[in-house]
Amino acid sequence: MARKKPRELYAWIAKNHDASSIALCCAALGVRREGYYDWQKRPCRRERDEALVSALKEVRDEHPAYGVRSMIEALSERLKPSYGKGYIICREYGLLQKRRKPHGITKANPKALPAEDLLKGDFKSETPNTKWLTDITEMKCLDGKLYLCAVLDCFDASIVGFSMDINMKTPLCTSALNSAVKRYGKTEGLIVHSDRGSQFTSHLFRETLANKGFRQSMGRTGNCFDNARMESFFATLKKDLIYRLPVYKMNRAEVRHYIFEWTETYYNRKRRHTSNEQNLPPLVKRKLFQEQIQAAA
């Protein structure tokens, strides 16, 4: 049985010490008497900490993949602790997230000529639709694998387009790109960055980019950090949704529905992003940007 925390033992002593002396209770439970008296002198702080723990647990339930900073930002101003205290409480109460090492599933075509890396690790953008990232991930479902290709805008980390299919051939990627263009239009010279997977070096994908006036950019082979923000999105998707569902017991149509709903109603509209000013959700930041442009016109 796990040993109780000192504060829990102090609370028991405070409730039950009438039957015997405080010194005897402390000795029996293996805690310091001075610690008990110090604990008694800080009821206001205890109440604040209890309220903070309760609030952090609520944030974790609503946002399973939030890091400590985002959890703190989601709290009301009166409860916000320092990062150090927030981290200690999250660690003590099991609210920290375990990180999984990202791994790519695309394979490079050794005969294809890769595009130049135009981003060189710079995933920031001051305006929408100037830098898009794209990649593929997979989910193992009851009736086989489901593949997702998504397009992320570096401006606000929003998913501007995505496509799902039972295979990871090039049309999966062109479909995701076309869905982004359908939603936000074409911006001449827009950079589309990916890894060196054969889907992205294919004639069909490159022709699609050229027809839209887009520029292609590629990271190094086998280096996930060259497309880190895209990998981060897939990690968030899996922590928030996929790892919390019995995907292996669900058919692809069900999983497809969950991914669509999570992306459109939660990730783009509600989930805070530390990469955005004031940790704004993606489409909230985009809306504010558009309002500022209109006000300045």
Where do the PLM segments sit?
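C-terminal domain-tail junction helix/linker
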Residues: 210-214, 238-297
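Conserved, non-catalytic sequence blocks in retroelement Pol enzymes and Pol-derived host proteins
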Residues: 45, 65, 78-79, 124-125, ...
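Active-site beta-loop-alpha junctions of metal-dependent nucleic acid enzymes
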Residues: 140, 162-185
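Mobile genetic element proteins and their domesticated derivatives, centered on retroelements
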Residues: 25-26, 36, 56, 71, ...
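RNase H-like two-metal-ion nuclease catalytic core shared by retroviral integrases
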Residues: 106-110, 194-196, 202-205, 216-239, ...
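Helical coiled-coil/dimerization "stalks"
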Residues: 1-29
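Basic, flexible linker segments flanking DNA-binding modules
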Residues: 2-7, 26, 33-127, 223, ...
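An active-site-proximal beta-strand-loop segment
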Residues: 121, 125-160, 166-168
